[in-house]
């Protein structure tokens, strides 16, 4: 029987505000586990989870693995470069072979938009999207919202601006969908060449100057330039990008209120963000990393059929 999130977590666009709040609320008791000397509860003991990453990842893959192990699940990491995929095996054949070994969940990252949904429609195991092309990265969006909610309280009416390479960013799309469902005002800022043509249809404000975005916002979520997805011509140079759109301490003087600084990583210091901002008093970047494990524990728990009202008991290792 499907849990409160359904069978899979493929994106934030299909979720209701109530489902998003459910994940954020469920993550809070799980966050305490990471503060303990013994960082493990038996909640998913006996479950087998496969991490199937077709793209390079450090934070997301490790965060999922920590979340799985802290819930006592058996974790299998498939190195695609050394698997049968490198010999021409299809995504579905790989997953079906894994499912024949009686797994329970698949966490997938893939360069093709829609890959997670394609897989979820063809296997019975739960599927969690850890990033598919430029489509969505739902757990990153959720952890960003938890980090914002920790500091700002109810996000309704709060102003969040996403700065940088929105065109190639699945993080931006998940944040836009999720934040708007929670009633936040969302804006984007970046070179027009790095903003989707139809960005206005998502109901966001567009800023051409980062100074104006800083003056408007309660928080900035700063994105790196995804050079690996670009052909030549999107920006004149990295130096020019930093000069015009880089978030610096001098630019933060334009803020009309205390401003939170988020970044999903990896950071390119000196390009989209300067070190004194990344490491400064307004930065909650490391809080995002901490919250990432808790949010992913909550998602795993809920997809496995865990009852939200028992999350506190699960956190104590008795449910």
Curated annotation (Swiss-Prot):
Top-level taxon of origin: Bacteria
Catalysis: reaction(s): carbamoyl phosphate + L-aspartate = N-carbamoyl-L-aspartate + phosphate + H(+)
GO biological process, any: amino acid metabolic process
EC number: 2.1.3.2
Transmembrane region(s): none
Keyword Transferase set for record: yes
Pathway the protein contributes to: Pyrimidine metabolism; UMP biosynthesis via de novo pathway; (S)-dihydroorotate from bicarbonate: step 2/3
Binding site for carbamoyl phosphate: 59-60, 109, 137, 140, 265-266
InterPro entries given in the database record: Asp/Orn_carbamoyltranf_P-bd (IPR006132), Asp/Orn_carbamoylTrfase (IPR006130), Asp/Orn_carbamoylTrfase_sf (IPR036901), Asp_carbamoyltransf (IPR002082), Asp_carbamoyltransf_Asp/Orn-bd (IPR006131)
Gene3D superfamilies reported in the protein's UniProt record: Aspartate/ornithine carbamoyltransferase (3.40.50.1370)
Alphabetical list of SUPFAM superfamilies matching this protein: Aspartate/ornithine carbamoyltransferase (SSF53671)
Residues that hold L-aspartate according to the record: 87, 170, 224
Pfam families, alphabetized: OTCace, OTCace_N
MF terms in GO: amino acid binding; aspartate carbamoyltransferase activity
Function: Catalyzes the condensation of carbamoyl phosphate and aspartate to form carbamoyl aspartate and inorganic phosphate, the committed step in the de novo pyrimidine nucleotide biosynthesis pathway.
Cited NCBIfam families: asp_carb_tr (TIGR00670), PRK00856.1 (NF002032)
Entry's family note: Belongs to the aspartate/ornithine carbamoyltransferase superfamily. ATCase family.
Assembly notes: Heterododecamer (2C3:3R2) of six catalytic PyrB chains organized as two trimers (C3), and six regulatory PyrI chains organized as three dimers (R2).
The protein's name in its UniProt record: Aspartate carbamoyltransferase catalytic subunit
UniProt source species: Gemmatimonas aurantiaca (strain DSM 14586 / JCM 11422 / NBRC 100505 / T-27)
């Amino acid at each position: 029987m499907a849990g409160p999130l359904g069978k899979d977590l493929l994106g934030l666009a299909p979720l209701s505000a109530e489902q998003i709040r459910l994940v954020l609320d469920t993550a809070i008791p799980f966050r305490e586990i990471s503060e303990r000397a013994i960082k493990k509860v038996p909640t998913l003991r006996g479950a087998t989870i496969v991490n199937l990453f077709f793209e390079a990842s450090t934070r997301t893959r490790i965060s999922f693995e920590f979340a799985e192990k802290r819930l006592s699940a058996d974790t299998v990491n498939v190195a695609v470069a050394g698997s049968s995929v490198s010999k021409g095996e299809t995504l579905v054949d790989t997953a079906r072979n894994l499912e024949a070994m009686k797994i329970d969940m698949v966490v997938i990252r893939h360069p093709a938009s829609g890959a997670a949904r394609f897989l979820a429609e063809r296997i019975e195991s739960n599927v969690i999207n850890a990033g598919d092309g430029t489509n969505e990265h739902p757990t990153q969006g959720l952890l960003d919202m938890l980090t914002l909610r920790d500091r700002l309280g109810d996000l309704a009416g709060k102003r969040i601006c996403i700065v940088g390479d929105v065109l190639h960013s699945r993080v931006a799309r998940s944040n836009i969908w999720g934040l708007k469902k929670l009633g936040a005002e969302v804006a984007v800022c970046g070179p027009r060449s790095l903003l989707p043509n139809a960005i206005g249809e998502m109901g966001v404000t567009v800023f051409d100057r980062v100074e104006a975005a800083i003056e408007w916002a309660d928080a900035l979520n700063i994105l790196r330039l995804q050079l690996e997805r670009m052909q030549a011509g999107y920006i004149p140079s990295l130096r020019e990008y930093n000069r015009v759109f880089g978030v610096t301490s001098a630019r933060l003087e334009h803020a009309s209120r205390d401003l939170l600084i988020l970044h999903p990583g990896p950071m390119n210091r000196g390009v989209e963000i300067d070190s004194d901002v990344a490491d400064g008093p307004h930065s909650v970047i490391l809080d995002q990393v901490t919250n990432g494990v808790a949010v992913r524990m909550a998602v795993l728990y809920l997809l496995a059929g865990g009852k939200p009202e028992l999350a506190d008991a699960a956190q104590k290792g008795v449910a």
